[in-house]
Amino acid sequence: PLIVRAVVKAVERRKLYSGFKKPRTFDTNLIVIGAGSGGLVSAYIGATLKARVTLIERDKMGGDCLNTGCVPSKALIRAAKSMAEMKKAAQLGIDVPAPQVDFARVMGRVRNVIKTIEPHDSVERFTGLGVDCLYGNARLISPWLVDVDGQQISAEKIILATGARPTIPSIPGLDQVEPLTSETLWQLQELPERLLIVGGGAIGCELAQAF
């Protein structure tokens, strides 16, 4: 079964690639599109294996995890945990003044945590590993060719690690209240009195827990 499956995949791949001309030589071994968690790990592994790697990103290095996901959400949860512990201190025989939240300072610490981790996902670090980092909009021309704002680069393999973006659901009236998303929420400087979170995924659950 494994041999048959491999043959079937090879035939399907040949049919898929039949409309494109494969270059005789390549500019690089591997192109990674997207510098989020998946893209950075892929580029790192490729560079570790001594492959020539080109990493393409159009926005911020680190992607969702560093800038609007894992890192800021954990920093916010840490602040929320401290607040919860102080509220329960009396149960442990510890008297503390009623804690107050300075939300602007909380968000300032969140940004500082991001800045602390940024160097690990930076262009400088990956350039030091031998990765060629490019900023721009990548567009697939063929299975081996990528256009980056007019510059064409060929590679033996291409990895798509472009991630995703928040989707605003079609709920009547939602567009009239200027809803936040998991990307724009981090711009808040005042703690909202009420917050409705639509979506029970990892980030949604973390934000609900923290707020």
Residue spans of the language-model regions?
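Glycine-rich flavin
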Residues: 3-28, 45-51, 56-191
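N-terminal Rossmann-like FAD-binding beta1-loop-alpha1 element of flavoenzymes
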Residues: 28-55, 204-211
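Surface-exposed strand-loop junctions at beta-sheet edges and helix termini
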Residues: 31, 185, 196-198
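Conserved N-terminal Rossmann-fold NAD(P)-binding element of oxidoreductases
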Residues: 33-34, 56, 160, 198-199
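Conserved acidic residues
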Residues: 36, 137-139, 201
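Rossmann-like NAD(P)H-binding beta-loop-alpha module
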Residues: 189-211
